[in-house]
Amino acid sequence: MSILSAILQGILQGLTEFLPVSSSGHLSLYQYFTGINSESSVTFSVMLHLGTLLAVIIAFRGPVWQLLREFFLLFADLFRGRLFKQKATPYRRMLYLLILSCVPLLLVLPLQDLITSVSADNDILVEGICFLITSALLFLADRAPRGHRDASTMKGKHALAIGVAQLFATLPGISRSGSTISVGQLCGLERSYAVSYSFILGLPAVLAAGILDLHDAATAGIGIEWGTALIGMAAALIFGLLAIRLVNYLIKSDKFRIFAIYTLVLGSVVVILGIVEKITCLLYTSDAADDLIGVD
């Protein structure tokens, strides 16, 4: 892989990871149209995701630090027998909710082979349909009334709903940020809180997925070009920070609908291309079969 390709994929990952348009879907399309090897592209995609993970840690370093602090204090309170004897702080409550949102991701392990096969195949029809699902969620969230819930008023059922949305976002074309922010808004979360909750929720998911994929790649003997991977990761980090600032601005200024329109148009085009490709493939197969019969 060239350095230019690594930079372009890093920029694409950094922008689309946080903009509600599906980074995995865009990377899948990029790799499909450029013909990049599917196995090596999976490990390279992991490195790009680690770059965006660092972007979240930097952008939300205050809340992330407080949540880490509460995580260790939680164990201290557990050993001292006072875990439920005092009122939870807002960050302790947010920590509980984030843990609850991660529970649906346990289903990823038995479904990992299916998800990987969909992500690495040469059929873009699935990506197109998933882009349309993202668009539908964004349109629904755009029409939802403004919510006012935060960590102090958010309920467990809301956390689970957001977690289920994140589970489905493992499919390429369904935006993780778009689906979790949209479901958060539909659950009545305040918009800026929905954004921060969504991005922070992605930290354990991205980290766990990265560790699993790198382990599988190492076990299978799939190599990775560390030089280009680190360059791509740096590009993803820089443009990820820019994208986070843009998302915060757009959601506060009621301009999120632009992404619903974008994913609707993109999804429609990809679905049409996918259908045309399937029809062409069927016709080619049919002609090849006729020629073979003629030869015989």
Which residues does each PLM region occupy?
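Small-residue-enriched transmembrane helix starts and helix-helix packing motifs
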Residues: 1-17, 131-135, 151-167
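Hydrophobic alpha-helical transmembrane segments
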Residues: 7, 95-99, 128-132, 160, ...
